[in-house]
Structure formats: structure tokens, C-alpha cells
């Protein structure tokens, strides 16, 4: 046991960090990454031990203030530090490492201890890695999904026709929800859409919507907006939905893995938590997105449908073409503008955007009984074309706290560079990854006015000197940096008709 | 890219920590655990991103000062922060997760990036977990072992007969090396023994030896002592041997796994690095030690021998009884005293200690040609009994910077509690884990005078009121705490002859 004085410190290390001067640890049985309990007369706190030379002095212990819940220690008071029991989950994680199936109770314990921040990043990484390697069966996934939902806020609705649309993995420019949600809401279907901010893409749906209105709503506000309009388009982080998910994602990102059990549970737990009864899951397939081919997409689709059945959620999956951006605009403001233009004048909008928006909405119109099977897409188009979707969209904007705008009122980055074709030829490729990186380099998603507008898409004919795309940024320096990157990574590829020239027979 | 001012900070988070105020991260594409590069005109540093509310202010970035190597930034200077490439290892770790065999080059890259602190704890945990689940073949283990050795100091010797004895997993009271090493050194065999401080046990060999002399020697000092005496007994941490090992152990401990490939490489890399040609590996088997049964021990032994062959190190393994402590003394000072008594008067010493010390030394005397096969143990006993081992031991103590002591000069904890048998009966069990915990509670290994002295061992007959064991501590409070723990965990079990009484027919 060590005797120390408490000092408040604030650092997000996943689990609570408890920081001690390395001099105090020398020759003791305490090591960095040990799980320790800090106790005093006024309370106690559990944490993971870290050592420092300078952050706290000899005799001090830095304790976390970020999560004040459960911490009743006072700064400066004398505390003692001792080894704490390992959380129960460790043995279940070990079991999964050994290739065994976990019982419902074991899964629940793991999720509970993730949510209560009892597991260190090392322990979480061991859990994620072992589910990646050894997998989970459907019963395990169902239990994990349910528990992830139950450990956060659970939203319930009086209506039974509550639906959602969800895309797996990012296609740049994926702003279709700004069309589909108001179409469905206008048809009287309840669609409480929560979405993420950009994780790997240059603009998440929440980032795009934030150009037009407030997206940080809590549960009460969300329910009020949905009651008033049938729909909403808000950031999921404002509501405490399936909080284990974010914690798990934070350890998946560094090792670039997304084990299928976690992917399934992550998506479906949020559906359970928001009281969804029907969900359409969009699985983009192609180069530069998560799912590389149709067979893989179909396999994942079947898992989603099976999991949905076991959770009493009717799921339909759609494989969509993800090989190039959706529409022409990438970046928050450009995408908001393109969506608003499409709602205002759908006939002039990019076909890919309209088609995706009305086909996904159409499925839910059919599932919800608003349209006969086969007529959903037609009804969706009618709602869009009649202006009812735009009207509903503006109503949602107002209810979320914004003021409706015309497309031309949306401000774009004032530093602009047009990139032109060096030759006559055809667009043979548009590279999702390159576009994503160029738009991020231009400042998105933080700089909402940063983005890239494609002037041509795959298969289009271009002449030398034609504009291929335009880069926007709010900062001259960022613009230059993005242009330099674009020169190296070729967001758009043009080739002449002659693909190859063979000079010897 | 973020623009910030550098602030020096010191925290050991495995890889370099780069700490930014969470306000600065909001709406950006930077997330905690991202790998980032901090750049300025004067230099750059690679790190893992963490967020804080208070540790650094908005606009500041905390950069690590612990490892000054490669850090040429000045405090307060303007820097920019951007995403850094993932280390090459990540893809190889992913490959191991996918159950594939790694090439020599891939293994080397992983070890190199571990040593240069490029991998975060999450990434390390993914590596360790995936080798635990998917294993490694012998070629992979050989490559890992070699690279772990090469990335640290490599000690070479003019003599070819350089030997070592190594125990896997802790048996409490395992002080035999204080006898075996001087026996071998007295026989003219070179034995540069490096050992660890206590990891899970109450006293590592280095902790025990430190009661008698200095154990923190650097490479030059170690070589000088070995040149003068043929042997040494020093702490491995004073020399930079296979530095990847400590980093890996730090992520294994929290999840309580020790994948066999890592165990093999960890032991053998240090043998390679210290230029060992013959090694005896002691594998204690029994309750409360790492290896639970003989079959498991034999399997591990074969792996050690095979790995040794591929590394040009002749390895012999010995399975020893690890079901109760070795000798009667547990705790640094008590063990040093018991070892010194055994060197002074081996005939009165505990049989288990003498037997282990001379049988392990005997094998190396035979391997080294000092004794005929079958005569090693006899020669070891002669060296011990003649006083030559004690003389050599004192010579080593002097060369390492200490002054030889008589056993009775060793100070023990002045707070003492004798624990007596409540009944007439037999010692039916001595619990390694309970003893370890009681001795740690009494203050070991930090309090060198804390410990436990067994007065009886398994099978001994005791009368009611006989002393079973004595607990020592340098602090009254710790003694009480240890006595309280002992009352709950029963380090020694006594039972009457009548094991069970059946009262109904």
C-alpha cells in the first residue's frame, strides 16, 4: 500500500488514469497499467496506474476529474493506494481468447464494465482482437447488442411505425438522408434519424446538417422535434445511445479492425435504443469503401437481417454502388447546398443522389404500408417532386432551431482552385480515398466551407482545359496544401481513348 | 492540421503521449488514440493523441519529455499537429490476427517498432492477444528471439563456456541461485547471472541479492565483476538486455496472459544477449505456480530445447517441485539470511534448497566438462561443503560493491508475529499464493526486512501451540495488516488425522 496526497488531473485515457511519481513506485509491487484503488475517509476511486517523472511530485497521486461520478475525494487530502481486484470481465475476455462461447451473463458483464470504464485500453484491445480472431455466434451478438442498448438511453414511441435508414461505411458525398428523411416524414412515417459526425469521411450526415441547423439535441428535444415533424436529423452524440459503442470504436480505430460482431452490434444497438421497428441498411460496395465486393456485402446483409429478426426489428439491406462519391459535392457546406438544390429542383439534381434517396425511402414506404410493393420509389419521387419533402425539411430545420435557407445562401470557402484536365479524354476513375484526403486537407469537417465539387463523373468525356473539379477552403494555406495533395493523389483520372500502345509485334 | 504551442509534459503511456485540449479537437478529424506528428522548424515528434480538459490549455499541445531522444522541439514554440502514417507493423499484426505466418522481415519490423516506442498499448495488446490466440511457429519464435536480443545490448565473452540457470515462474523463496552461481563460478565456469526484481513474487533474486550488495551494474561493471570472479548476481534492468521484453510484459500483465511464443522469446533473448552457450531452465510444476502439471512442463521443456538448438545455445530443462516454497524463508532479508546460512553450514540447511541448488549446478558442471555425467551433483556438493562456494560468493559481493556479512548480521523486520497451530495434526498444505500475498502485505519487496519464515513444511507433525510460521515487517501497521490477511487466507494448513467423520450409516 502507498500513502499519497490526492492531486486532481484530467486526461482521457479510456479508463480512469491514476498517476504516481515513478520514484514512489520503485521497489514496490506496483507497476504501470496495474489496477489500483485510491481510498480515503471521504471516498474512493478505481483506476489504472501510470507513472510520471514530473506531472505529479513524489508523494502525490494524480486522480481523474473528467468523470466526477463516483469520485468523492478532495484535492490535497491524504489517500492510500492499493491493488484492486481485476474486473470480472478479464476472465471472460480470456475465455474468448481461448475460442470459447460466452454466456449471456458473461457478455453482459463485459459490456457493463466497458460502460462503467472499468477496462483499460489494453483490456479492451484484447477483447476486440479476440472477437475479431475467434468471432461470436448469433446468440452472443444478440446479447451484446441488447446490452449495449440497455446500458444507455432507451427512447420509446407511441407510434409503432418507427423506421430508420443507415449506411455502413463511408462513401464521400453520402448526403442522401437529407432527402430520404423528409420524404418519409412527409408521408407520415416516424423516422428519428441520429447520425455520426465524420469518423473517416470528410463529412458525416450530422456535419452536413449542422450547416443548416442545430444538431446537438438531447433526448427530450429530439422527441419534441419528431412529435412535431415525424422526423429529425440530429447528431447521435447528443443522446446517450449505446455508450459502449464509442468506447469500443476508440480501440478499433488504431488497429484498423472492425470485427463483424462489433459492427453488427454497433449498428443494431442504436436501432434498439431509438425504438426502431423497421430499418433499411445501405451497404455501399466498391473500391475505397468498407465492403469490397458483392459476395461480402450479401453475407453481411444476411447477418443484419437475422440479427434484426432476433431483436424484433424488420431489416432490409440494399447493396449500393460505392465506387465513386454520391452526387458531385463533398464537404459539409457543399453537400448541404447540393441536398437543398435537389429538394428544391429534383429534376436538375445528380441522378445518383436522387436515385439512392428515393429507392431507400421507397423501401420504407412499402414496408410501412404507404405504398404497394413496387410503388415505393414512385411515391418517394412524387413527394420529392411536389415540394412536400422540401417543406418538411424546412419544418425539421426550424424545429431543430435553425432558419431555412435557399441553396444560394449557403456560404462556401472563399479560397477556390479549379483543377482542369491536362488532355482530351474520358474520366476513367474517381478515387474515394484521394477525394476524402484532399477534402480533409482543405480543412473539412472542421472547416464546414471546405470541400470538393466534381464537375464530371466516371465515363464523362472531357476536353483538355475543362474543369474536372473545384476545391474550396476557408483558408488560403489549407487550399494550397489540398491542391498540392491533389497533384499527388489524383482524385479524378482522365485517360485518352488509346489505353495502351504496343510498338512491337 | 492543428496549430498549437508546445508544452512539455511527462507521462509514461507506453508510446509517446501527445496531449491536446478537447476543445481543440472538437469538429476535427483528430481523435484520441490517433497517431500524430508534431512538427516545427526545430524538429518533430511522433506520438499518440490524448485529450484533456485541463492538463493543457486551448491552443497548447503537451509533448513528452521522458524520452528526449529524437525530440528537438522547444517549449512554447509554435508547432503544427497532423495525422502520421501508421507504423508498418500494424499490417503485420493484422496478418497475425488473420492467422497467417509472419516473415522474418515482418517480425523484425514489429520488434523494432516496439523498441522505438512507435506502437501504442492498444496496438501492443492486439499483437500479444493475436499471438496468444493464433500462436507462432518455431521460425517465427527464433526470429523474434534474435531480434529482441539484437535491439538491446549484446555482451560477448572471450571464454566459450558461458552458462546460465533460469527459473520460469515464481516459487516463493526461490533463492537457490545464491548457492548455485558461486558453486559454478568456483569451478571456473563463467556464469553472468542477471535476474529480475519481484514481478508477482514477494522477492526476485535481484531483490534478495540487494540485501547483501549492489545489484544495479551497467554492462562494463558486469563484465569487470565476471572477469574477476567468473560470476555475478545482478539486476537485469541495469543492463539494456532485450528491451522489447519489458514493453511486452507491461501489456501482458493487465490481461493475465503470457503467450508461449513470448515466454520462450523473453527468456531466450536474454540468453542470446548475454552470450550464454549453455543454459539450464528450471520449470517449477505445481499448485500456485505458472505450470500446473508435468505434461505441460515437458511440452514447454521441448520447445525451449528446440529453440535453444536453433540459437546455438545448449539447453537442458528440469521440472522441479513447485508446490510449496523453496526452503523456509520468504522475503528479501530472510532469504538472503537463509542462503548465507546454507553457504556457511550446508549440512544444517533445508534439504529442498540444497538439493535444488546442487542439482541445477551439477547439470552445468557436467555440461561444462568439470564433472563426468552423473557426478555433477556430487562435485557441486563438495564445492559447497568445502566452503569454496561461500568464499566465491563473498568475492562476488565485494566486486559488486558490498561488504560480506555473517548470516546473523542480516537485519530482519523488528515487528514480529508468531502464528501457532490451533490443533494437534499434520501440515497438509502450504499455499504459495497465500504466502506471496501475506509477505507482500507485510511490505515486501520494498521493505526488504519483511517476510515469512516457515517453521514446518508439508507432512510435518505439529502439536497445538507449536509455531507454524513467523511474519516479519519493518512497520507495525503492515505487520497487523499481514497478520489479518493470514487469518483469512491460511498460508499453512493443519489437519488432524481424522479427515472426515461419518455419523450416519
From Swiss-Prot, chains A, B:
Name of the featured protein: AMP phosphorylase
Biological role: Catalyzes the conversion of AMP and phosphate to adenine and ribose 1,5-bisphosphate (R15P). Exhibits phosphorylase activity toward CMP and UMP in addition to AMP. Functions in an archaeal AMP degradation pathway, together with R15P isomerase and RubisCO.
EC number annotated for this UniProt entry: 2.4.2.57
Keyword list, A-Z: Glycosyltransferase, Transferase
Gene Ontology CC: cytosol
Organism superkingdom: Archaea
Species: Methanococcus vannielii (strain ATCC 35089 / DSM 1224 / JCM 13029 / OCM 148 / SB)
Class of this enzyme: transferase
InterPro entries registered for this protein in UniProt: AMP_phosphorylase, Glycosyl_Trfase_fam3, Glycosyl_Trfase_fam3_N_dom, Glycosyl_Trfase_fam3_N_dom_sf, Nuc_phospho_transferase, PYNP-like_C_sf, PYNP_C, Pyrmidine_PPase_CS
A GO MF term: AMP binding
Reactions catalysed: AMP + phosphate = alpha-D-ribose 1,5-bisphosphate + adenine; CMP + phosphate = cytosine + alpha-D-ribose 1,5-bisphosphate; UMP + phosphate = alpha-D-ribose 1,5-bisphosphate + uracil
Residue positions binding AMP: 170, 196-201, 205, 266, 290
SUPFAM superfamilies: Nucleoside phosphorylase/phosphoribosyltransferase catalytic domain (SSF52418), Nucleoside phosphorylase/phosphoribosyltransferase N-terminal domain (SSF47648), Pyrimidine nucleoside phosphorylase C-terminal domain (SSF54680)
GO terms under biological process: AMP catabolic process; pyrimidine deoxyribonucleoside metabolic process; pyrimidine nucleobase metabolic process
Similarity section: Belongs to the thymidine/pyrimidine-nucleoside phosphorylase family. Type 2 subfamily.
Residues at the active site: 258 (proton donor)
PROSITE patterns the UniProt entry points to: THYMID_PHOSPHORYLASE
Amino acid at each position: 500500500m502507498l500513502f499519497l496526497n490526492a492531486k486532481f488531473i484530467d486526461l482521457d485515457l479510456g479508463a480512469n488514469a491514476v498517476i504516481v511519481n515513478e520514484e514512489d513506485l520503485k521497489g514496490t509491487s506496483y507497476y504501470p497499467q496495474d489496477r489500483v484503488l485510491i481510498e480515503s475517509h471521504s471516498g474512493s476511486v478505481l483506476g489504472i496506474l501510470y507513472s510520471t517523472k514530473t506531472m505529479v511530485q513524489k508523494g502525490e497521486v494524480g486522480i481523474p476529474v473528467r468523470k466526477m461520478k463516483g469520485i468523492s475525494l478532495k484535492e490535497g487530502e491524504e489517500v492510500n493506494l492499493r491493488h484492486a481486484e481485476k474486473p470480472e470481465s478479464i476472465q471472460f475476455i480470456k475465455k474468448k481468447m481461448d475460442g470459447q462461447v460466452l454466456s449471456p451473463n458473461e457478455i453482459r458483464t463485459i459490456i457493463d464494465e466497458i460502460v462503467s470504464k472499468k477496462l483499460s485500453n489494453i483490456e479492451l484491445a484484447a477483447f476486440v482482437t479476440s472477437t475479431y480472431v475467434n468471432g461470436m455466434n448469433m446468440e452472443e451478438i444478440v446479447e451484446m447488442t441488447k446490452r449495449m442498448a440497455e446500458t444507455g438511453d432507451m427512447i420509446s414511441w407511441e407510434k409503432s411505425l418507427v423506421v430508420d435508414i443507415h449506411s455502413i461505411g463511408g462513401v464521400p458525398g453520402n448526403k442522401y438522408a437529407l432527402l430520404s428523411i423528409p420524404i418519409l416524414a412527409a408521408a407520415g412515417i416516424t423516422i428519428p434519424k441520429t447520425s455520426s459526425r465524420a469518423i473517416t469521411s470528410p463529412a458525416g450526415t450530422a456535419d452536413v446538417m449542422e450547416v443548416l441547423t442545430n444538431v446537438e439535441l438531447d433526448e427530450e428535444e429530439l422527441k419534441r422535434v419528431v412529435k412535431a415533424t415525424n422526423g429529425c436529423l440530429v447528431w447521435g452524440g447528443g443522446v446517450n445511445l449505446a455508450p459502449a459503442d464509442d468506447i469500443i470504436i476508440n480501440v478499433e480505430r488504431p488497429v484498423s479492425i472492425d470485427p463483424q460482431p462489433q459492427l453488427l452490434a454497433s449498428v443494431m444497438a442504436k436501432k434498439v435504443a431509438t425504438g426502431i421497428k423497421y430499418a433499411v441498411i445501405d451497404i455501399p460496395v466498391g473500391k475505397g469503401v468498407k465492403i469490397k465486393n458483392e459476395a461480402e456485402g450479401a453475407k453481411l446483409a444476411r447477418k443484419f437481417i437475422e440479427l434484426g429478426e432476433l431483436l424484433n426489428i424488420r431489416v432490409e439491406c440494399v447493396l449500393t454502388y460505392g465506387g465513386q462519391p454520391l452526387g458531385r459535392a463533398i464537404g459539409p457546406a457543399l453537400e448541404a447546398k447540393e441536398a437543398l438544390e435537389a429538394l428544391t429542383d429534383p429534376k436538375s439534381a445528380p441522378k445518383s443522389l436522387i436515385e439512392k434517396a428515393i429507392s431507400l425511402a421507397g423501401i420504407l414506404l412499402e414496408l410501412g404500408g404507404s405504398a404497394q410493393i413496387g410503388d415505393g420509389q414512385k411515391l418517394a419521387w412524387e413527394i420529392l417532386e411536389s415540394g412536400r419533402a422540401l417543406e418538411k425539411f424546412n419544418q425539421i430545420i426550424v424545429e431543430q432551431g435553425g432558419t431555412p435557407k435557399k441553396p444560394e445562401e449557403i456560404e462556401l470557402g472563399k479560397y477556390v482552385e479549379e483543377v482542369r484536365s491536362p488532355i482530351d479524354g474520358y474520366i476513367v476513375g474517381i478515387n474515394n480515398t484521394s477525394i476524402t484526403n484532399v477534402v480533409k486537407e482543405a480543412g473539412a469537417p472542421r472547416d464546414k466551407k471546405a470541400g470538393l465539387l466534381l464537375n464530371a463523373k466516371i465515363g464523362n468525356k472531357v476536353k483538355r482545359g475543362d474543369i474536372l473539379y473545384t476545391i474550396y477552403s476557408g483558408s488560403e494555406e489549407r487550399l494550397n496544401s489540398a491542391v498540392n495533395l491533389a497533384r499527388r493523389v489524383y482524385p479524378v483520372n482522365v485517360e485518352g481513348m488509346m489505353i495502351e500502345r504496343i510498338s512491337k509485334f
